[in-house]
Amino acid sequence: MINIWRALTHRFFSSGFENWLYWDANQLVRFHIIDRKDGNRVGVFTAEPFFVFHHINAFERDEKIYLDACCYHDNSIIKQLYLKNLRSPAEPGQKKLDVTDVRRYEIPLGELYDADTEKPLHKGSDGLDYSSLCSGIELPRINYEEFNGKPYR
């Protein structure tokens, strides 16, 4: 989440953008679904907390929106990417950087009924509200000219 006060006053206090952000492990992620025709919100779905730098793609198929993103369990990756931390050796037995998890969220369009009511995403038999596609990818690249907003492999 963003602390607006810190964002507005960062120049006075010489603080970086990471100080505008704060992590709340109890705060659910919200997916706001917007109608492409009129720009109105038509629904809100929630998921377990995660931190994301980069979205890969989103597309609609079979009455669902599929959203793929590179996700972290929390925002600790921000400080891990500081130059001083990247230049220093990792402690024995400690990982230097968190590994991203490429996740696919399936948002059921058939369950849109109230733009102001938050509805949790369905959880699978594994208890997760997403599918894990792979790990270790950041700065993803797909053929955007051909597949942006469309299904892909």
Located regions from the model:
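Beta-propeller domains
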Residues: 1-153
